[in-house]
Every structure is written in structure tokens, then in C-alpha cells.
UniProtKB/Swiss-Prot annotation:
PROSITE patterns: RRM. Keywords: Cytoplasm, Meiosis, Repeat, RNA-binding. It is found in: Cytoplasm. This is Meiotically up-regulated gene 24 protein. Residues 394-404 have a biased composition (Basic and acidic residues). GO terms for biological process: meiotic cell cycle. Residues 299-355, 409-482, 500-571 form the RRM domain. GO terms for cellular component: cytosol. Has a role in meiosis. It comes from Schizosaccharomyces pombe (strain 972 / ATCC 24843). Residues 383-404 are annotated as: Disordered. Its main location: cytoplasm. InterPro entries: Cwc2/Slt11, Nucleotide-bd_a/b_plait_sf, RBD_domain_sf, RRM_dom. Residues 384-393 have a biased composition (Polar residues).
Length: 654
């Protein structure tokens, strides 16, 4: 195999023509039978025979025959410098690169180059923080038999090196180039990309459950939960045979807050400290999350218009079939009650079922606030919990504390009169469509949730700046609980024209208003109904858009509404009030001149000339009418041709 090489040296260029042949008689050595060094500018030509040991011996190296004295007669016996490289390197002709050699074929344990090579630019310099080394192009004086070109356009060979094969900690390194059939050492293998947050159970958002251990034998869950005021709960799990209980919060930030508050000093219950540990993490179900976002669901069910005959036993019989009840509180003077369940799913079932039940149509059944969410007064002085690894774990309560009106769509109305009706409150709202309208007449308060943030801010500013009275009382305004962004399902439905107002037509004439209300109330709480019996049509406004969506999908299936047309109608809360017509010419943009112009034409004799320099055109675009003195006005302006009667009275001389 013939190979042409050009090796650049300092001050000279050497051209080498080599023919490497396999000499079977030379014990498997490669013999360079024609190794002719022609040095330009020298007195002669140096010829030498070089051999490359190709054996499997670990001590194989480059050897040269007669390294000190040239055997070529034309050279005149000129002595040359020793051209032997460091014996710890060998040449890979096929790969055209050289790799440090050791006992196992990979990285050497130690390298001791000769002193003259330490200062050489071709000697490889290793960095402690790097796992690879770049070999620059060596001069021919050090590596005469290296098949390396000095041409800068040819890429330089790379050799990977590590100073310690067994690191205490795996690190990422470039791919090692081992010999065939030998795996790379452990230090050269790429480290696995592992993150503690890759698993769904490693996210901080899922750590919502806490185990309370070391409970007394005779304890009540209601007594224990009355001491917890860190945030609303999703469920409470207890086992009668074990003296422990598992409480699951809706928000992981509340769970961390409760743990950090009571873990150092202990949670004291019945004179004994309880053990606090985190349970297995579990994500919040999507169905419960949507219900909490849309309807502010909780474990607490609020009951309004409660009959006086209902006591705790009757309520437990009526609501106990949906799930286990944790606590019941009845306010007989206000005819209201609060029922706390052990699981939020049971409370959702109650609201969805009984709010549409005709037997309970006179009751007001909705969600109340969880009594575990009542924070102590010192909460404002504490800092809110935020995870450094996951900033999204900041609770909604903390965000509301930082900025009350930052992206909030819920407006609070207070100081309402007892005679105030729900439709009267909606008649005051003309700033945008509503997502939810929750009026609590027993507490004289109301919560209005708009579709957009801008509409909520406009309505809040309107009530804050203007003195709005309703039944003689000024309405107090504030911000309610942060509503968060609009759910994607409602957002898409609103873009398609959905609203809380539903139009129906072509219904049976035999239906009365009471019967129609019972049918429409099956899909949710109603704010107002407008029934046009003569036209067999009407409008129903629900308190929530979700209820209106149920009615639009469910009414066409009803037997009495098969022939009727059901569709959404615009929400009246997003329609601006029509301004009353005014007789003021300024508000009607009517020129004032037509009102001050007399209803008759002046005689020519009574029309004074327009003074010079005056503008005959006013801003109104009507010809200027000069001012006429009182004496020049005729006595009878009904006709301009009437004679001029004397202006004196017949009784002046009497």
C-alpha cells in the first residue's frame, strides 16, 4: 500500500514515499522497504529502514534501525536526532489517530513523558475538569512515522482520557472509543438523567394528605376538626380499629402550612401530642377540581328556607343517605342550617340532586364555606408558603392576600335590605355577562362572578365611586374569594353564544306559571322567569351558566318541550341601560338658533343691517340673526303685515 505524506517541519518540508509491506520472515513486523527522506536544502538524502512492532505485547512501540546515524551513502553519514517518540504511545494506522496505551487498552494509570516533550506544543495537556484531550499536529522531529498532516483543513484526531476510572460520582462524559469486544469502563458510561420530580408522586402539588397518629381511644372527629383552621378539606378517613386519622386538604399549600405550624411544637389534642406525618401523595381528581373552580364546592352544604319542623334528626335522615355527616349546625331563628360531610364528593351529590328535586324546590341548597378554612387572625402576620422547587404550590388564599383585585372576577355586595330580590340586584348590573350569581338574603349579602376581569373591575369601581341605593340602603362593595381563570369548557361554550339566559317558545298553552317553574327549576337555581303566555314563549335566567347549559341540552327531551325552540338569549346584565330622552337641545345636538328664532319673518323695515366686520355664520352652521331690540318687535307677531298700533295705553291719562 503506497501512501504519500507531507510532514511540515520548522524551516523545511519533507516529502516521504512509503510502501509498507508485510514481511512474513520478519516475525510479523511491518518493514518499510522504501523509506526515503528527501530533505530540501540539505547536502544529501537520508534513508533509513523503520519497523513497527504489530505484536500483541503490551510493550510494543515504534522502533527505528540506526536512529543516530543515517546509512545512506549520499547523506555522508550525517547523524540525525533521535526520532523515537514516547514508548507509552502507539500508532493506529487504520483510524489515523493515536490513543494512550495502558495494560487494559484504555487510559494509562500514569504517564511519564521525557523532559524534552513537556515543553513541546505537540505534547497533550490534560485539564482536570475535562475528560478529553486534543492532540495538536506534532512536528516530524518527534513523530516521524505518524500519519498526520500539517494541513489545517484536515481535522485533528481526538483521544479521550480520564485520570480516574472509578469516580465516586458518575458524571456525563463523551462517548468512549473502546476496542472491539471490550465494554467501556463505568466512569466513561453516561450518567442517567434522573430528576426527583419526574414521577407523578414526587410533585409537591400531590402532598395534600396528613396522618394524625397517637389519638385517644374515645375521641370525636368533629372535636378534632374544630381545632384545624388551615384550609378546606377534601376528605377525612378514619379506621375505628386504629388510633389514627388521615385528613386530605384541597390545596397542598394548606397541608404544608398545617405541618409547619404544628410539627415543631406538636398538635395537642385531649392533653396529648399527636404525631404528624405525610401520607402517600395523590393528585386532586379533575372532576372535583372543576366543581371547586366553577361553583366553589366544599364539604359544607348550606340549607335555606328550612321548615321549622326540621331538626337535627330529620336533617340527618334526609341527607345521611348521600354520605357520612361530620357536623350539623342549625340556626332556627334564621331558618338555615349547615351540614358538613366527611367527603366533598357527598356534598356535591347533595347539591346536584336536591337542588333539582321538586320536593325541595322551596329550599335553598348550595355550598357553604368549610369551617376548617376559617383562619386565625394572626394569619396576615405570617408569610405564605411557596415551594422553591415548584412556585405553583402557592395557595389561592396567599395570592388574594398579596393583591385582592389581581385577576379576580367575583364582587361582594353587602348591606342589602331584607326586601331585596335577586332580580333587582341583576337589574343594577350593566357592565358584562355573569358566570354565577349567588344571593344569600339571610345574611344580606351577594356574590356576583363576571365572565371577564374587566367587567368585574368596572362594576366594582362603579359601586365604589357612586352612591347606589337599593330600598333606601347604600350597597357596600368589596372583592370576594378569588375566582381564578374561567374554565376552558365554559370559555368555549361562551364563544359559541352560551349565557345564563335561555329562550323557549311554542310550548303547551295548558302549562301554568307554577308548573313551568317546576320544570325549569330541575336544571338549577333560577334568578328570574319571564313568561309570555299569549305568545307561548318566555325567558328564564339561571344563576349560573352551567345550569343554563343543562337546560338547553335537557329541555328538548322533555315531552312538553318537544315542539318548542330552545336557544340561548343575551344576558341582560351585559346590555347597557337606555338613556332617557331629554328635551335639552345640547344633549340632542340640535342647534340652539332654531329655538331662539322667532316664529315669524321680520319686516324689512324692522331688520337692521348686519354690522360690518361681524361673522354671519355661527358655529351651528345657521345664518346669523341679528339682535332686535324690544321696541322693534311688533305687538302682534302673528302676522308681519299688521299695522303699527300706538304703544301707549288708553288708561295712562286716567
Amino acid at each position: 500500500m503506497a501512501i504519500m505524506h507531507k510532514i511540515g517541519c520548522a524551516g523545511s518540508e519533507v516529502e516521504t514515499d512509503r510502501v509498507l509491506e508485510k514481511d512474513q520472515a520478519n516475525n510479523g513486523h511491518f518493514v518499510d522497504s522504501d523509506c526515503c527522506f528527501q530533505e530540501t536544502g540539505s547536502t544529501g538524502t537520508a534513508n533509513s529502514i523503520c519497523t513497527l512492532n504489530d505484536s500483541e505485547d503490551d510493550n510494543s512501540s515504534l522502533n527505528s534501525v540506526d536512529n543516530n546515524e543515517c546509512t545512506n551513502l549520499d547523506c555522508g553519514g550525517k547523524k540525525h536526532k533521535n526520532l523515537s517518540p514516547n514508548p507509552s504511545f502507539h500508532v493506529n494506522i487504520n483510524a489515523a489517530e493515536f490513543i494512550p496505551k495502558s495494560h487494559n487498552g484504555y487510559a494509562p494509570k500514569s504517564m511519564n513523558p521525557p523532559p524534552e516533550q513537556l515543553d513541546s506544543p505537540c505534547y497533550p495537556h490534560f485539564d482536570q475538569d475535562s475528560s478529553s484531550v486534543i492532540y495538536p499536529s506534532p512536528p516530524s522531529t518527534y513523530y516521524p512515522n505518524m500519519y498526520v498532516s500539517a494541513n489545517t483543513f484536515i481535522p485533528m484526531p481526538y483521544a479521550h482520557y480520564t485520570d480516574n476510572m472509578y469516580h465516586a460520582k458518575p458524571v456525563n462524559r463523551p462517548n468512549f472509543l473502546p476496542r472491539e469486544g471490550t465494554p467501556p469502563p463505568f466512569a466513561q458510561q453516561p450518567a442517567e438523567q434522573f430528576s426527583p420530580f419526574n414521577s407523578e408522586y414526587e410533585s409537591l402539588l400531590d402532598f395534600r394528605a396528613l396522618i394524625l397518629g397517637n389519638l385517644p381511644v374515645d375521641y370525636k372527629i368533629s372535636e378534632l376538626l374544630s381545632l384545624i383552621h388551615s384550609g378546606p378539606l377534601e376528605k377525612i378517613q378514619s379506621n375505628p380499629g386504629k388510633r389514627r386519622i388521615i385528613i386530605t386538604f384541597l390545596d397542598s399549600a394548606d397541608a404544608f402550612f398545617f405541618y409547619e405550624r404544628y410539627h415543631p411544637r406538636g398538635f395537642i389534642f385531649h392533653g396529648r401530642p399527636l404525631k404528624l406525618t405525610f401520607a402517600r401523595p395523590s393528585p386532586l381528581p379533575e372532576s372535583i377540581q372543576n366543581f371547586c373552580s366553577n361553583t366553589a364546592a366544599s364539604r359544607n352544604v348550606f340549607i335555606g328556607n328550612l321548615p321549622s319542623s326540621y331538626h337535627e334528626k330529620e336533617i340527618e335522615e334526609a341527607f345521611g343517605k348521600f354520605g357520612k355527616i361530620e357536623h350539623i349546625k342549625i340556626l332556627s331563628k334564621k331558618n338555615i342550617a349547615f351540614v358538613h360531610f366527611l367527603n366533598i364528593r357527598d356534598a356535591i351529590k347533595v347539591v346536584r340532586t336536591l337542588s333539582c328535586d321538586p320536593d325541595y324546590h322551596s329550599w335553598r341548597i348550595f355550598f357553604g364555606s368549610d369551617r376548617c378554612a376559617n383562619h386565625p387572625p394572626s394569619f396576615d402576620e405570617r408569610s405564605c408558603f411557596t415551594s422553591k422547587q415548584n412556585p405553583d404550590t402557592t395557595s389561592d388564599r396567599c395570592r388574594q392576600q398579596e393583591s385582592k383585585d389581581n385577576g379576580n372576577r367575583t364582587v361582594f355586595l353587602g348591606n342589602l335590605h331584607t326586601k331585596t330580590k335577586g332580580h333587582e340586584i341583576c337589574d343594577l348590573i350593566r357592565h358584562g355577562g355573569l358566570q354565577d350569581f349567588h344571593y344569600i338574603p339571610e345574611k344580606h349579602i351577594c356574590f356576583v362572578t363576571f365572565i371577564t376581569y374587566s367587567a368585574a373591575n368596572a362594576f366594582h369601581d362603579y359601586l365604589a365611586e357612586e352612591e347606589v341605593l337599593l330600598h333606601g340602603r347604600r350597597i357596600k362593595v368589596g372583592w370576594g374569594k378569588e375566582s381564578g381563570p374561567l374554565p376552558r369548557v365554559l370559555e368555549d361554550s361562551i364563544l359559541m353564544g352560551a349565557s345564563r339566559n335561555v329562550y323557549f317558545s311554542h310550548i303547551s298553552d295548558s302549562l301554568t306559571t307554577e308548573e313551568l317553574e317546576l320544570i325549569l327549576r330541575q336544571y338549577g337555581e333560577i334568578e328570574s322567569i319571564k313568561y309570555l303566555k299569549n305568545r307561548s314563549s318566555g325567558f328564564v335566567a339561571y344563576t349560573n351558566i352551567s345550569n343554563a347549559m343543562k337546560a338547553v341540552n335537557g329541555l328538548p327531551i322533555h315531552p312538553l318541550f318537544k315542539k318548542s325552540k330552545i336557544r340561548y338569549a343575551p344576558d341582560r346584565c351585559e346590555q347597557e341601560l337606555q338613556k332617557s330622552k331629554s328635551n335639552s337641545p345640547i344633549q340632542q345636538n340640535v342647534p340652539l338658533q332654531q329655538f331662539i328664532t322667532p316664529p315669524f319673518s321680520y319686516p324689512v323695515a324692522y331688520c337692521p343691517a348686519i354690522p360690518p366686520g361681524s361673522d354671519p355664520i355661527l358655529n351651528f352652521g345657521i345664518q346669523y340673526q341679528p339682535f332686535i331690540p324690544f321696541t322693534a318687535v311688533p305687538s302682534f307677531p302673528f302676522n308681519c303685515n299688521v299695522p303699527n298700533y300706538p304703544q301707549t295705553s288708553d288708561h295712562e291719562n286716567d
